Amino acid sequence: MTPGYRRDCVRQQTRSDDLTTTTPDRRAQILDSSAELFARKGVAGTTVRDIGEAAGVFSGSLYHYFKSKNAIVAELLADLMGDIAARFELIEATASSPVEIIRGLIRETLTVIELHPYATAIYQNDRNYLRAHELLEPVDRASRGIREHWLEAIRRGAEEGAFRVDIAPEIFYRTVRDTLWSTTHWPDRKQYTLAEFSELMTTLFFSGFCLVLDE
């Protein structure tokens, strides 16, 4: 057997494992490989062949698991938004006050960003592609539901005297949301553990930066 033929056999054997690996495991492998590629190269810059090579399957075999490249993108984003929604619902169901709800929403937002770094990058960096291929509306629809968790807690906190009433709930919500999601690009973010960074952000939003305010 020649070396070249042996390499071809090994490659064929490696990629044929998609026939023996369970479907859930194979789908997860494809999703993981695709997410990293999309985040690094952009969705438009990633080909089906790229995904197949990264996942260790023939590109034609991908269609047994996903109808298209965009179907993979849609599932990655759906997983991201579904995780956020589930975590927010749990916080809302278990927290004892609006302050604790907001504290929990801050913590869980940062948790999701850490658990889904590639999907987060896709959502932030590929919005034009997502919009052009009708992939953005499902995400925006889910975002509107998530937004209500924030606004309901902020309004309730203001009514109960826990939060200021001279700052519109929408302004506070957008400030917190945009700041949290932008932290993926902060070079000093990695200096803190998730718990430390969550507490730092909570302190900043709740207590501000001034030690003494001039009246």
Identify the meaning behind each predicted range.
Residues M1-D25, D32, L213-E215:
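N-terminal intrinsically disordered/low-complexity leader segments
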Residues R26, K69, L76, L80, ...:
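Hydrophobic/aromatic residues within well-ordered alpha-helical segments
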Residues Q29, L37-A71, E75:
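Helix-turn-helix
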Residues I30-F38, T109, F205:
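Short hydrophobic clusters on alpha-helical segments that form packing/core surfaces
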Residues E75, E89-Y118, P169-V176, S198, ...:
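Hydrophobic alpha-helical connector segments
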Residues G82-E89, L115, H133-E160, E170-R174:
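Amphipathic alpha-helical packing segments from all-alpha helical-bundle domains
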Residues I91, R107-E114, Q124-Y129, L204-G208:
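Helix-loop "lid/cap" segments that line or gate small-molecule binding pockets
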Residues T120-N125, L136, D140, A158-L204, ...:
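Hydrophobic/aromatic-rich alpha-helical bundle segments in the mid-to-C-terminal region
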